[in-house]
Structure formats: structure tokens, C-alpha cells
A protein has these predicted regions:
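Active-site-proximal beta-alpha core segment in soluble small-molecule metabolic enzymes
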Residues: 1-132, 146, 154-157
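Short coil/turn connectors at secondary-structure junctions
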Residues: 7-8, 28, 51-55, 94, ...
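Structured core elements
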Residues: 33, 57-59, 100, 134, ...
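Short, small-residue-rich loop/turn micro-motifs
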Residues: 60-62, 137, 204
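Feature marks short, surface-exposed loop/turn motifs that line or immediately flank catalytic pockets
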Residues: 64-66, 105, 141, 175, ...
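Glycine-rich beta-strand-to-loop/alpha-helix junction loops that act as flexible
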Residues: 102-104, 133-142, 171-173
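Polymerase palm active-site segment centered on the conserved acidic dipeptide of motif C
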Residues: 151-169
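Charged (often Lys/Glu-rich) extended helix/loop segments that serve as interaction or gating elements
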Residues: 154, 168-284
Length: 284
């Protein structure tokens, strides 16, 4: 998408590459980060043979993250992501030009500050051998109250300590934070044992999976979470999965078929996690 829509090759990372996919990965990438030394050793000869100057790096694990939800914590004990300092050789293999680290999720600059302390403590020994340091995503710099001046000071300080390093950030959600809603329509209202469910023409498991996996609680326009109001409903998805629902929400009026239900600030996940489970249509 970066290449086709923006005309720019991507900084690419995957927990594991396959020989079938790797030629296309190289075509679309300016930088490729490997999750393990074994993956680097397997595919680096292909990078050399391709000869387009792709810069290769390795993902590191500083064994520190302030992400509280285990599902989103890339540095949880036993994580499959990245290499710990004790497993890196004193001299990096020829061809490794950078370190990539991803430790954040909708995080502040102060969490980045703490993470940098751990990265420098454990990995700065190798900084003289690399050209770039990618600090990954999860930096929610567009959220109200984010201290951008503190972020600038952090990055300037890091650059002053290691002037030869190119410092890279990959904010993701920050680009789409509070920029789009998911609008659904009530197609039926059912009741079972006193529980009313408004069935929608969208699906939590297909279109909003984080609501079930986290669970992330979306804001619903014109409703309050909880069962304390007069007009209380579950919101149900239109798939066969029994757990494809969320609730309860209290509305200020009785819902009716054809009414629109608006989920606030959903664009950053509905864009990338849709699927055709049950033949459910993608959001338009």
C-alpha cells in the first residue's frame, strides 16, 4: 500500500518471512527488519543478490514495556518478538545495519523516556555498529495532552548522544486518532429473558475485533455504557458467532429498526482488520 498509494518503499517487519513472499517484500521495502538471527541468515543472501540497497536490521527486545494489557504487550515474558541482549553476539553479523524496537501502545512520551533508558542500558554497546534505530509505533502524539515538547527533547537528546544514528518513529494510530467513525444500522431487535439486543448490519468479530479481543470498549454516540438507564440494549453483530455482541448500553429513547448506531473513533482498526468471515461485507 505504501508503494502503490504513496510511491514510497516501506520499512518492513514481520515475525517471520517465507521464501514465497520474500521477493515481493524486497520489491516494496527500503528497510527490512528480521525477528531473529536465523531469519536474517536465511534471507540476507537474497537481499544481497537482489542488489537494490535494502538496509537490514534486527528487532531487539529490551524486556521492558508499560503496556498493561497482555494482548498488546510486545515485551511480555516469553514474547516471540525480538532478540534479548544476552543472545546478541559481541560483533553483529555483517549486513545488520539497524535495530528495531516496538514497546508501546497508545503511549506517552514519558513511557518512551523510560523505555529508552532500558534500550540504552542493554543495547548501546552495539550502537557503534549500526546506522539506524527504529523506535517503532504506539506513540500517540496526536492525543490531547500528549507532551510533544518533551518528545522533541527526548529525541534531540538521543541524537546528541549518538549523532551517527538515524532515529525513526512509526506512529500508527496517531495518524487516524479521532478521525473517523463506524456507522451501522439496526436491522432487527430481539429479546430473550428480558435482554434486548439490537442486531446491526456490522460485526464485532469482523469489523471491530479489538472490542472482543481486548476487550476495547468503544464509545457509542448518544449512549452511555451500562444497564442503569430506561432503554437498555446489547448491540449484536450479524455473524453466526455466539459472542459477536457487546453491551450493555443505555439510550435516552427506545431504539427502532433502521436507526443508525455510530461507533466513535473506530477508523484505526476497521481499516486493517476486516475479513470475510460468514461472507460479512467489508465496511464501505
Amino acid at each position: 500500500l505504501a508503494l502503490e498509494e504513496f510511491g514510497s518503499k516501506a520499512h518492513t517487519y514481520s515475525p517471520a518471512y517465507t521464501e514465497q513472499d520474500f521477493p515481493e517484500i524486497m520489491r516494496c521495502s527500503s528497510h527490512i527488519t528480521f525477528n531473529s538471527l536465523a531469519q536474517f541468515q536465511r534471507f540476507y543472501p537474497m537481499v544481497l543478490a537482489e542488489g537494490s540497497g535494502i538496509s537490514c536490521g534486527i528487532r531487539i527486545n529490551p524486556e521492558y514495556s508499560e503496556v498493561e494489557t497482555e494482548l498488546y504487550n510486545p515485551c511480555a515474558p516469553g514474547t516471540r518478538f525480538g532478540i534479548t541482549a544476552d543472545l546478541l553476539p559481541e560483533v553483529l553479523p555483517q549486513g545488520i545495519e539497524g535495530f528495531h524496537c516496538h514497546c508501546h501502545c497508545e503511549s506517552s512520551s514519558f513511557e518512551l523516556e523510560h523505555t529508552l533508558q532500558h534500550i540504552e542500558e542493554k543495547f548501546s554497546h552495539w550502537f557503534s555498529q549500526i546506522k539506524w534505530l527504529n523506535l517503532g509505533g504506539g506513540h500517540l502524539m496526536t492525543r490531547k495532552g500528549y507532551d510533544t515538547e518533551h518528545l522533541i527533547r527526548l529525541l534531540q537528546g538521543l541524537k546528541s548522544r549518538y549523532p551517527h544514528l538515524q532515529i525513526i518513529l512509526e506512529p500508527g494510530s496517531a495518524f487516524t486518532w479521532q478521525t473517523g467513525v463506524l456507522t451501522s444500522e439496526i436491522v432487527d431487535i430481539v429479546e430473550s429473558r428480558g435482554i434486548k439486543t439490537a442486531i446491526l448490519n456490522v460485526s464485532f468479530t469482523c469489523h471491530m475485533p479489538d472490542c472482543l479481543e481486548m476487550p476495547y470498549q468503544p464509545a457509542v454516540r448518544g449512549a452511555e455504557m451500562g444497564a442503569n438507564g430506561t432503554f437498555v440494549y446489547r448491540l449484536g453483530g450479524n455473524s453466526c458467532l455466539s459472542g459477536d455482541y457487546m453491551g450493555f448500553w443505555s439510550f435516552d429513547h427506545e431504539l427502532r429498526m433502521g436507526e443508525r448506531i455510530v461507533f466513535e473513533d473506530m477508523i484505526h482498526y476497521t481499516m486493517v482488520k476486516t475479513n470475510m468471515f460468514n461472507g460479512i461485507h467489508h465496511p464501505s
